[in-house]
Amino acid sequence: MSFNTLIDWNSCSPEQQRALLTRPAISASDSITRTVSDILDNVKTRGDDALREYSAKFDKTEVTALRVTPEEIAAAGARLSDELKQAMTAAVKNIETFHSAQTLPPVDVETQPGVRCQQVTRPVSSVGLYIPGGSAPLFSTVLMLATPARIAGCQKVVLCSPPPIADEILYAAQLCGVQEIFNVGGAQAIAALAFGSESVPKVDKIFGPGNAFVTEAKRQVSQRLDGAAIDMPAGPSEVLVIADSGATPDFVASDLLSQAEHGPDSQVILLTPDADIARKVAEAVERQLAELPRADTARQALSASRLIVTKDLAQCVAISNQYGPEHLIIQTRNARDLVDAITSAGSVFLGDWSPESAGDYASGTNHVLPTYGYTATCSSLGLADFQKRMTVQELSKAGFSALASTIETLAAAERLTAHKNAVTLRVNALKEQA
């Protein structure tokens, strides 16, 4: 189906409607699963030697020193323009402001007299950040991951990226307080972070995007007892735009294309009650597409994308909630009024002047977001992902005495005798003291 084909939602059967919102398949092939499993086991067994072999095989790079030196990082920064460094600093300032505001206040309450309950927050001790390489290094992801890690107070923050690591990535890592950087990419980097090697430290939790092999490696290590936790399930990028008759077609088209250029498996959807706007957006997409260096990639993504005409904006919101997009852009005259009705989205962009690019780089929100429908149960990345919450309780003698019979009754009902005894013994001890 061509992206300039308008689809009348209300003329479609329920089966057709479900098909329109179906995402491209992303399940890992058996060969990827087996290859990744072998890589994980090899890195765990052979450490740095395996990492160097995989760099030569996959990255076509002979790596002598896996760890990047401070001198190399300084040299990378010197090669960058002041304009870019200033832009990174400005972005980090906004990211810091937004994520610092997410700090949870401690909870300290008496649930009843003499029964004190608390919730306290602690940082994840060590985290590993994975940043893909390639022709367009995602240094902005360094800002999005390393900044909240620093605010959270993570004691060890390390980064892996395929060699040779781009200057922008090295500078961004230094700017955000990353302590160690390693010339390691792919599934082997995930293995090194999960299990540790002679050079790369083992971490508690791994963050960051990647290709099918990286995604599968993260999935596998998260399910191994000797592995590591991960940030969230990953899938292709996606955007859904809700537009009304007052939307600017060129703006809408540019937002759709900014997502489509990410990769051929990205998906973009336009929902609008105005067929004329849909037609104008399709025309604007074609005009802008002709000027994009990554036009071939974007065109492939558009083949799985949709222009859908609805009855009204309320129906647009209902369809969006059903789909649960990673990015939701609302270009309507009442954009703010629609927010309360949105139930599933990774990040929402309101009005004509809030392009997705703002959140991708510098507004302050995090651009690491749940995709592939995981917005139904997962949140956008934030400070809490680099922290853990712990509860504390303390009962005075009087508080314990008042609660004892309740605990004994509940424990007896569950036939957990030792639980009941732990209370009864203390009750008897208090009676003896009286």
Curated annotation (Swiss-Prot):
It comes from the Bacteria. The active site is at E326, H327. It is an enzyme of class 1 (oxidoreductase). InterPro entries: Ald_DH/histidinol_DH, Histidinol_DH_CS, Histidinol_DH_monofunct, Hstdl_DH. Keywords: Amino-acid biosynthesis, Histidine biosynthesis, Manganese, Metal-binding, NAD, Oxidoreductase, Zinc. Changing H262N: 7000-fold decrease in activity. NAD(+) binds at Y130, Q188, N211. Zn(2+) binds at Q259, H262, D360, H419. Activity is lost when the metal is removed through urea denaturation or chelation, and can be regained by addition of metal. Pfam families: Histidinol_dh (PF00815). Substrate binds at S237, Q259, H262, H327, D360, E414, H419. It catalyses: L-histidinol + 2 NAD(+) + H2O = L-histidine + 2 NADH + 3 H(+). Coiled coil: none annotated. Its cofactor is Zn(2+); Mn(2+). Its EC number is 1.1.1.23. Pathway: Amino-acid biosynthesis; L-histidine biosynthesis; L-histidine from 5-phospho-alpha-D-ribose 1-diphosphate: step 9/9. GO terms for cellular component: cytoplasm; cytosol. CDD domains: Histidinol_dh. One of its GO terms (biological process) is L-histidine biosynthetic process. Binds 1 zinc ion per subunit. At high pH manganese can replace zinc. One of its GO terms (molecular function) is zinc ion binding. Catalyzes the sequential NAD-dependent oxidations of L-histidinol to L-histidinaldehyde and then to L-histidine. Belongs to the histidinol dehydrogenase family. Homodimer. PANTHER family: HISTIDINE BIOSYNTHESIS TRIFUNCTIONAL PROTEIN, HISTIDINOL DEHYDROGENASE HDH. This is Histidinol dehydrogenase. It comes from Salmonella typhimurium (strain LT2 / SGSC1412 / ATCC 700720).
